[in-house]
Every structure is written in structure tokens, then in C-alpha cells.
Amino acid sequence: KTLGGKGNVIVHGGTPGNPMTASQAVGWREVFAKHSGIKVLEGPVDTNWNPALAQKVTAAAIAKYPKIDGIMAETTGPIRAFLAAGRPIPAWAGQDLNQLSCLWQDHHAANPTFKMATASAHTWLARLALRKGLAAVNGINNDEPSLINLPFSEDSTSSDKALRVKCDKSLPATAIPSAMVSKEDMRMILK
């Protein structure tokens, strides 16, 4: 929506062959196929979900491509690459992370193209999977869904207050806003 059906995009992935990057690629390829003006310059690029590697990969892309309109990434390394290069931060799609939200809060005013939408990092899915697994092993019915559609967690372009960007400087950078854990527990876990 933010790109208006046209623009140059770079997509980062995680580890080579991981199912999350593969399933996301199915989705974005389907969407981008409907918008011939969107060009994927690179991706999914394996970054091992490592912010330093993602920054390095993005720095190389910045040197190679004069115009990058969007990034899909799960780390904040690409933001640091744009800041270091003195280039405007482009539109961003990824997973919710406190550090990402705080970087948006700190830099969006000076970077009007830095619009951000995140989906839940879905750390809470382990809890759901464990309950379903235990129910299956013990012959107990579990009606929780097996397929989950991840809605937006944050959308800087939305007027919906529930989707506002959720920077909390009292929490560690690695805190995940959608984790369904109290702030106190998150501080303890991420010490």
C-alpha cells in the first residue's frame, strides 16, 4: 500500500532454506506479481537473522542501487546501513521488535519515506504448539487453530491506535511487543 504499486524492494531472509523465509516469499511474490511496478532488486537474501550481516548486505545494496524504496527484514541492521550511508530510510516491513520501533520513533521525522508495518514476531506460537502437542500425546481435544493469520502488529500509516508504533525505551532493544509477556517479565527474561 505504501509503495503505491511501484518501487524497488530488497527482501532479507533468515538462514538458508528456513521455512519462515520460504513461506513469506510465497506471500510477497503473490502480492508483487499483481503490481508490475514493484521490482525486487535482491531477495530473499540470507542474512542468518544477524543484524551485522544484514547491515553489511544492505550497505552493499545501497552502493549498487541508487534507488531503494522498500525493505523487508527482521533485523535493524539495514536501518543502520541507511543511516551510515546518509541515505533516506525507505518503507519498512518486518516483524515487531522494540529496537525497530524505537529507531522508527527516533528517525521517522527526518526520513518521511520511513513508514513501517510489522507483524507479530510470533514468539507466542511456541506456547500454542506445546499445548497442541501435549493435547495430542495425551488424547485431549484442543480446539485452538493450527493455522494462524498474523495481523499487523504496528502500522505507522494507520489511524488505528491499536496499530501505533510501540517503542518502549524502558525495555531492552530485543523485547518483542507482541510477546504476550508482561514488561516486568520481559525485563527479567532479557537481562
Residues covered by each model-derived region:
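Hydrophobic alpha-helical segments within soluble ligand-binding/sensing domains
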Residues: 1-9, 23, 54-55, 98-102, ...
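Short, solvent-exposed amphipathic alpha-helices that sit
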Residues: 19-39, 57, 81
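Short beta-strand elements at the ligand-binding edges of bilobed clamshell
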Residues: 1, 11-13, 109-123
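Hydrophobic alpha-helical
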Residues: 28, 47-105
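Structural recognition of the beta-strand scaffold that forms the well-ordered cores
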Residues: 8-12, 41-43, 69-73, 90-95, ...
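Short beta-strand elements in bilobed, periplasmic/extracellular small-molecule ligand-binding domains
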Residues: 8-11, 32-51
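Hinge/cleft segment of the Venus flytrap/periplasmic-binding protein
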Residues: 12, 16, 121, 130-191
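Extracytoplasmic "Venus flytrap"
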Residues: 13-23, 76
